[in-house]
């Protein structure tokens, strides 16, 4: 943590002003989730992973979203059934820009929507028979599918359906994995529990009990896996390029553009490299305990973190990999200098004050990419973080930064109104609100239909997109209401 931001601004006073709008009980509860980072603090000073206040407009998702939308959904050669009423699956269909290689309906099924379409009678009498039929139809229509997952919606956990029994029976009948995921939306306080449940299902239903390689698999000393990169806009491909450039072999990449076979390859890796810590640390820890595979978190957002991560990864291998890492960093440095120099010229000497809205696991990695462009983060937070996420956040942000956990729509709008930033980086729910307020905005849950943002090439795209947002001439025509 270095220097401070928001100098001359009474940020604590702003927090108090925003909290004044709440009734006393809600004000006391929300006050625990809002803080201003202090020098030498042991953590960010906010409570996390606690239920949202009923009635507020929260930005969180549910356990179903965490399982299907994040962990399981991008696995491309499996079919993921939204088991329950049609709405949950329909409104989350293709909601994330997980890129794939393959032919839709043949070996790429992630862009398609499958649902058991629960009706009232299914809720009253149970849906196990219907689930049997759905799985049979899927196998008949898509014979090349390598596996099926059952993503439970809320009614499944309420009416006592035996999806585990159905899964075991159909797995034996079809000779393919049929995986039950108890990710009903009412479980937990956010999508974070859905991540955890999905990780546990991979542990119990997919990972082999033994580590002997399959026939034809040739192990090397440089085998690694990419975990928790969902290939938004091609991010995982950009990360893979760098890892292969330094001499490593990526034997599994999931779940973005991932396959069932890659999941099964996981225990053969020498090191597991995890990008989205919050959503995938559970399975990484399990493999360390079960198979003795070390893991490390890496960050390929922005050149500072890319160089640091490449060196940390290379340190786990021999001198050849270490030398290659330095060569790769040096190779891309001229491009980085050009991108940063151009960004500085375009900024016209102004500070880019970015309140980075809750981005879940993405919050922490993205911060330094803004710093690399010479921008200041004046406010940031998570929507589904745990305490350890905030502990890991401290060295990324500066003293005086506004920290908010599970920020409500009202709070975020008021903070933006009072702090008047140059750019808001947030999610789709907030995009049009702030654009109508006359503020530059980037939708950072799916890179605003751009990307990739990982890697050196991704940093150039990131810098271009931030420049286009901030320096768009339309903002000279529109005026913010404040």
Swiss-Prot record:
Gene3D superfamilies the UniProt entry points to: Nitrogenase molybdenum iron protein domain
Binding site for [8Fe-7S] cluster: 62, 88, 154
Example GO molecular function: nitrogenase activity
Annotated coiled-coil segments of the chain: none
Cofactor: [8Fe-7S] cluster; [7Fe-Mo-9S-C-homocitryl] cluster
An annotated GO cellular component: molybdenum-iron nitrogenase complex
Cofactor note: Binds 1 [8Fe-7S] cluster per heterodimer. Binds 1 [7Fe-Mo-9S-C-homocitryl] cluster per subunit.
Pfam families reported in the protein's UniProt record: Oxidored_nitro
Catalytic activity line of the entry: N2 + 8 reduced [2Fe-2S]-[ferredoxin] + 16 ATP + 16 H2O = H2 + 8 oxidized [2Fe-2S]-[ferredoxin] + 2 NH4(+) + 16 ADP + 16 phosphate + 6 H(+)
Organism superkingdom: Bacteria
UniProt binding sites for [7Fe-Mo-9S-C-homocitryl] cluster: 445
Transmembrane segments: none
Broad EC category: oxidoreductase
Task performed by this protein: This molybdenum-iron protein is part of the nitrogenase complex that catalyzes the key enzymatic reactions in nitrogen fixation.
Family: Belongs to the NifD/NifK/NifE/NifN family.
Name of the protein in question: Nitrogenase molybdenum-iron protein alpha chain
Organism: Azospirillum brasilense
